[in-house]
């Protein structure tokens, strides 16, 4: 559950369009930290999605991995080179580790993920620049 003051949403600009449906929470928290906000939570509060349990598929696992590495790439708390290392280079390492372990399909999937991240480098760079500003850039009037 989120309780975010309107002033904070306006200062941070709302949720970044780079993240659709997954990853927006991690990105928003990264931006809260960057803009010197603190986060509180209540360990006794429990939230649950109202849906059936579904086992994680290979595709679901890869999507989770992609969103995680995308959020690392977009993390404005890191200098560009560190963000690149925690995302693109980390995915490359996973591809090589999978290859060495004989997990050829997984290695190929990670290489594909690396290409997808690299293809979005310019877009990510632009969002990183925008997200450093304190203005309601993603909030529509």
Please give the residue ranges for each predicted region.
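A short, conserved alpha-helix in the catalytic core of glycosyltransferases
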Residues: 1-13, 18-46
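A broad detector of the eukaryotic-type serine/threonine protein kinase catalytic domain
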Residues: 14-17, 52, 93
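A contiguous binding-surface segment within folded domains or other stable secondary-structure elements
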Residues: 31-86
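Surface-exposed beta-strand edges and their flanking turn/coil or helix-capping segments
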Residues: 27-30, 54-55, 97-101
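Short linear sequence elements within intrinsically disordered, low-complexity coil regions
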Residues: 20, 24-27, 33, 78, ...
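Residue-level signal for well-ordered alpha-helical scaffold segments within enzymatic catalytic domains
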Residues: 7, 11, 31, 70, ...
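Flexible, glycine- and charge-enriched loops at secondary-structure boundaries
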Residues: 22, 57-61, 104
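Non-catalytic, C-terminal membrane-associated alpha-helical segments of glycosyltransferases
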Residues: 62-67, 80-141
